[in-house]
Amino acid sequence: MNVFGITELKNPVKEKIEFKEPFELFKSIYSEYDSSFLLESMESDTGLARYSFMGFEPQMIIRARSGFIEVEYEGSREEFDTENPFEFLRQFTRPAGKSRGFCGGLVGYISYQAARFFDSINLSPGNFPDFEFGLFLDGIMFNHLTGECSYISLKENRLPEISELLREETPTGHLKYRSMGTLFSRRRYLGMVEEARERIAEGEIFQAVLSNATDYRLRGDRLALYEALRRVNPSPYMYHLKLGSREITGSSPEMLVRVEDKQIETFPIAGTRPRGKTPHEDERIAAELLSDEKELAEHLMLVDLARNDLGRISEFGTVQVPEYMTIRRFSHVQHILSHVTGRLRKGMDALDALGAVFPAGTVSGAPKIRAMEIIESLEGVPRNAYAGALGYLSLNGNADFAITIRSMVAEGAYGRIQAGAGIVHDSVPEREYVECQNKAMAVLKSMELAGDGFDSDEPFIARR
């Protein structure tokens, strides 16, 4: 299958449009179409927040499952056998033009389990696809540096539909939810931490990131959670992705990888503390974080891992660390952050860059492959979209992906919020358990703001 032959792509058409507040427009799009996305930047740091994009009704949807690719196109569905589904995607990432950012292409998510296609590792397939992308050939782009809003189209011009939606007002929805309990009890999670520490003491690994999750039964408007999350935890990577029955809502602080005009960058985050109640307390907590030898050692380890990952696909001598161990603050937590860059080697593309860093060391551990094997044995449940990546592969060869954390992953009437903590030799199990709770706090607070709980006599069965 050749996407360029099927879609008969034109040169990009770009038209400036007057717009209301971006999210207000997206509410109308979300309620009108079965599949849509909003990739939004809500951070003053322009190094992380340059553009916001939204799109609707993709040309096709592509899903990867064990052994085959599934393509939905113009009302039909086809399946193709494949050993590595990511090779199928290369036809969509052929560089075409010099435009910056996203100019149409694949928008979607990659599940954590897809790491088995990038490295020799035995991970059990999850109940989510290994990846799921919509091919979006038009959409709306917001440039936060210039304040401009543009409609971009590579095929059919659907600007009249957008113009109609601009005149509509869609009321805020309401979400109802009921907790189905956590994936691991406190006692079991503490035991997992102890076992990971034993593996570290035996020299198998230096670090492993162990996660816990809370499952929910959902009713009502999933977008209400995103609207609340925008207020509670504005972040450089805000997203709401709806592809049929699956929706992912999140506010990730962490870039997995960005490729733009052959330049590669990533921002490893490791080292976490809660926010203070006052600016003075914030500074005190940050100073304590930056003097914590355990946190500093963990961060250094993950910066080195990021440097090694980029080194696999970068021109010799181009990998640099222009920003090292700075504090980045969000609504409920503050982190230590570094910036690692490189220049893509000749013959490599955005998929090579994605494969080199996936999954992030900050959600797996070091050495990465052995850490993932230990995580698989201890957690025993596929992570699915959590700790994978969400973003775009643009038809101009660019890519931008966030790590799928600080998110609700929903399918049908069920949703899951998951968060992890990095375990090292000096970890205190109770403290790591609390760190998982702190990292999930922004999404949990947003759930409370977006709606309320409901009671039901209906039995609930967790998807395990």
Swiss-Prot record:
InterPro entries (UniProt xref): ADC_synthase, Anth_synth_I-like, Anth_synth_I_N, Anthranilate_synth_I_arc_typ, Chorismate_C
Binding-site residues for L-tryptophan, renumbered to this chain: S41, P236, Y237, M238
Description of how activity is regulated: Feedback inhibited by tryptophan.
GO biological process: L-tryptophan biosynthetic process
Residues that coordinate or bind Mg(2+): E298, E435
Keywords from the named record: Amino-acid biosynthesis, Aromatic amino acid biosynthesis, Lyase, Magnesium, Metal-binding, Tryptophan biosynthesis
Coiled coil (residue ranges): none
Residues that coordinate or bind chorismate: G271, T272, Y386, R406, G420, A421, G422
Assigned EC number: 4.1.3.27
Cofactor, free-text remark: Binds 1 Mg(2+) ion per subunit.
GO molecular-function terms, A-Z: anthranilate synthase activity; metal ion binding
Cofactor: Mg(2+)
SUPFAM superfamilies tied to this protein: ADC synthase
Claim: Plastid is one of the keywords in the record: no
Metabolic or biological pathway: Amino-acid biosynthesis; L-tryptophan biosynthesis; L-tryptophan from chorismate: step 1/5
Catalytic reaction list: chorismate + L-glutamine = anthranilate + pyruvate + L-glutamate + H(+)
Job of this protein: Part of a heterotetrameric complex that catalyzes the two-step biosynthesis of anthranilate, an intermediate in the biosynthesis of L-tryptophan. In the first step, the glutamine-binding beta subunit (TrpG) of anthranilate synthase (AS) provides the glutamine amidotransferase activity which generates ammonia as a substrate that, along with chorismate, is used in the second step, catalyzed by the large alpha subunit of AS (TrpE) to produce anthranilate. In the absence of TrpG, TrpE can synthesize anthranilate directly from chorismate and high concentrations of ammonia.
Family designation: Belongs to the anthranilate synthase component I family.
Oligomeric and partner information: Heterotetramer consisting of two non-identical subunits: a beta subunit (TrpG) and a large alpha subunit (TrpE).
Protein name: Anthranilate synthase component 1
